[in-house]
Swiss-Prot record:
Gene name per UniProt: purM
Catalytic activity: 2-formamido-N(1)-(5-O-phospho-beta-D-ribosyl)acetamidine + ATP = 5-amino-1-(5-phospho-beta-D-ribosyl)imidazole + ADP + phosphate + H(+)
Keyword annotations: ATP-binding, Cytoplasm, Ligase, Nucleotide-binding, Purine biosynthesis
PANTHER family, alphabetized: TRIFUNCTIONAL PURINE BIOSYNTHETIC PROTEIN ADENOSINE-3, TRIFUNCTIONAL PURINE BIOSYNTHETIC PROTEIN ADENOSINE-3-RELATED
GO CC terms, sorted: cytosol
Highest taxon, organism lineage: Bacteria
Organism expressing this protein natively: Bacillus cereus (strain Q1)
Gene Ontology BP annotations: 'de novo' IMP biosynthetic process; adenine biosynthetic process
Name of the protein in question: Phosphoribosylformylglycinamidine cyclo-ligase
Keyword Ligase appears in the UniProt entry: yes
Length: 346
């Protein structure tokens, strides 16, 4: 049967076109250590030039979750790849690792070349922001598994750090200062609740501006996750950082303790940073309790670093010079868990 595979729903020619269109974006991410080009069976990266005493590779993998459904609804696909990169590289930089390379996995119902190109364009932008090379990936056309408009997106990154410079959090003591780096918005966690609260129950429109939002709701919800790699690596060159937490699913309450020793807790000062209007809208429309908000969302802080009190102001200044909005948001205390001072934040 001629064109049997195409009749089964897999268009090989469209796949070839998608690869051809993405190459110019991938090329912008290349580093001198990358060996070979796009299209090989495996991506190669030369580690021989890294002058580290005890080099340690650090890996991370993640996806974008149901934020993808907002991209489908808005038919906007050129930034969701930034989210995929951010979720991976932010996870490994908290251990002090410099991201080296990234690989993506796209599974779709129909490999529409322009859509795949836009997804990879976003992935490439994320890689440039993180300073890592996009050295490979897989686009799997899977009719029957996904509708023609649907796709899933995941990624994998590898970074490197000298063993003696790994940031573990084990030396954090009571009295260390916690500095928060502002998020761009919701980032990539909690979107199942976001959709239920705002779109299903609240029946809000993606095209309208609500409350104190500055953008239509759809644009606000699709703001890409902030990538903190470059400012954090710059910080690590100049100051001792005792611990870091990427504030993802589980919010403050689950993620900050991940960097703390068992006997140390965190005391957060509400009102010490600006919480974006999207979180107020979510709480108001969904009638959500403040504690629940802090247990699900980043609440305006995407990364937390722990430093000595005498370094705190200088660290804030350095991060601000790197283009970040940084605030002292609390300190570590004897005890366990996360407590909040200062009343209502929203």
């Amino acid at each position: 049967m001629a064109n049997a595979y195409k009749q089964a729903g897999v268009d090989i020619e469209a796949g070839y076109e998608a690869v051809s269109r993405m190459k110019k974006h991938v090329q912008t991410t290349m580093r001198k250590e990358v060996l070979g080009g796009l299209g090989g069976f495996g991506g190669m990266f030369d580690l021989s030039k890294f002058a580290l005493e005890e080099p340690v590779l650090v890996s991370g993998t993640d996806g974008v979750g149901t934020k993808l459904m907002l991209a489908f609804m808005a038919d906007k696909h050129d930034t969701i790849g930034i989210d995929a990169v951010a979720m991976c590289v932010n996870d490994i930089v908290v251990q002090g690792a410099e991201p080296l390379f990234f690989l993506d996995y796209i599974a779709c119902g129909k490999a529409e070349p322009s859509k795949i190109e836009n997804i990879v364009k976003g992935i490439s932008e994320g890689c440039r922001q993180a300073g890592c090379a996009l050295i490979g990936g897989e686009t799997a056309e899977m009719p029957g598994m996904y509708s023609t408009e649907e796709y899933d997106l995941a990624g994998f990154t590898v970074g490197i750090v000298d063993k003696k410079k790994i940031v573990t959090g084990e030396k954090i003591e009571a009295g260390h200062v916690l500095i928060g780096l502002a998020s761009s918005g919701i980032h990539s966690n909690g979107y199942s609740l976001v959709r239920k609260v705002l779109l299903e129950d609240g029946e809000l429109s993606l095209d309208r501006i609500y409350g104190r939002l500055e953008l239509p709701l759809g644009e606000e919800l699709l703001k890409p996750t902030k990538i903190y790699v470059k400012p954090i690596l710059e910080l690590l060159k100049k100051y001792e950082v005792y611990g870091m937490a990427h504030i993802t699913g589980g919010g403050f309450i689950e993620n900050i303790p991940r960097m703390l020793p068992e006997e140390i807790g965190a005391e957060i000062e509400l009102g010490s940073w600006e919480i974006q209007p999207i979180f107020s809208l979510l709480q108001e429309v969904g009638k959500l309790e403040e504690k629940e908000m802090f247990n699900i969302f980043n609440m305006g802080i995407g990364m937390v670093v722990a430093v000595k009190e005498e370094d705190a102001k200088d660290v804030v200044r350095l991060l601000e010079e790197q283009g970040e909005t940084a605030r002292i948001i609390g300190r570590t205390v004897q005890g366990a868990g996360v407590t909040f001072n200062g009343g209502t934040a929203l």
